[in-house]
Amino acid sequence: IWYVMSDIFVTHDQVVQTDGDIKKLTLADNSQITFNEKSSLSYPESFPGRERRVALKGEAFFAIAKNPEKPFIISTESGEIKVLGTRFNVKETTNPSGIEVLVEEGRVSFQTKSKDAVHILSAGDKLILNNTTSQMLIQHKSNMNDLVWFTHSLEYVNAKLGTVVSD
């Protein structure tokens, strides 16, 4: 894969996941990415331009190294997530086609592929976009148990037993 960034050709590496595997990767800028199964990321060996850009298919948790001069941008089929330094999860969904962005710490912006909307998400916010209907939902104070694949733990406060058992 070749990308043109400021008239510089950058070769991209790719991490591809298989069934049942969770893999960790540290990028050249010290950003850390944990991939869920069946996920892939296209990324450059280094970030020579004015931005740090990667492309994600599937689901990954990002802990992005802060660098205000070089925003970190994640491209997906549904849109782009832009961040300066934070921790968040991105999950592409297939049925229905769409994306979920859950922010654990900091703030990110999400811009739809058609560039008709930009949404700022803060810690605890979850954006859900259905590509088929173009319906978007933003939940505040979201359930961080959605990160169980990454954290390996569930947390409940005043929850009903049925909710705990079903999770």
Residue positions per predicted region:
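A residue-level detector for the "anchor" residue at the start of short, highly conserved motifs
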Residues: I1-D167
